[in-house]
Amino acid sequence: MKLVMYAHGGSKNHGCEAIVRTTAKLLTEIDSRPILLSYKKEEDEAYGLYQFVEIRQELHEINKKSPDFMLAYLRQKLFHDYHRMDALMHKKAINELPAIDAALFIGGDNYCYSDVKNYAPINDYMQKKAKKLVLWGTSVEPELLEDKAIREDIKRFDLIVARESISFESLKKVNGNTILLPDPAFHLPCEKVELPEGFVEENTIGINLSPLIIEHEKEKGCVLANYENLMEYIIKETDCQIALIPHVVWESNDDRTPLRQLYEKYKETGRVVLVEDHNCMAQKYIISKCRMFVGARTHATIAAYSTCVPTLVVGYSVKARGI
């Protein structure tokens, strides 16, 4: 059988990286070297994913002289529908695939967000290429399924693997081919690395903060203020160290930006460590050595859950509640 994974954002999001690594390992008996369509091929190469998947660039420049472009342009201008235009960036990579037995939509996180309609035309292209479509390791906001277009997109999948019970209960009402299994990243192994200077094994509280959480705050500044209150309490009332641990390091959405703010404020206490970027397995190892963990990124918290580290999630979507 030949498999392809698509809708992968790139490995500087270590949750995306973890899904690719574990999915490839879990399905190795079906396809020992699946194809990975990636939005950012160079990131995946930098983190070594080429060792077990064939990486292909998913996004390409749109041919503005093509009939597809003209039709998408008219839809955008006449009906304010930009989804077909966005999908054209994916079409070339999908058309160039060999015969595919099963295509796995691995960007299951994306069905938590309001722009999910972008994916229906991409799935249209993939459905013409692959014998079976799978929505892999997904979470879906239940209210999004009230939209007819989103329901129709969900119905097309031959298999849906929901990773938590809230999404499972909602999805199975729309598509009976829905099963419940843990996020594949629960299977991710740790990769031992040297712990940062100042990190005291099993007496360090890990903290992760994301720009996305800050974007969703209802009162400007409240997220950082609450993290500061937490850190001040830990410093004053306990003997624990604090490790600030990034899990997404995209330039446009980099956990290190708010974490550096926190580090600069408290570094003189000698109690705070800013962890550098590593691959997802090494970050999981560092998280596994924490006494407890407070995290915003879904797969940072999965790294903690799956190594039995007590975890508090700072979340804004069904992922945080469900997992």
Model-predicted regions and their roles:
Residues 1-323:
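Active-site anion-handling motifs in enzyme catalytic cores
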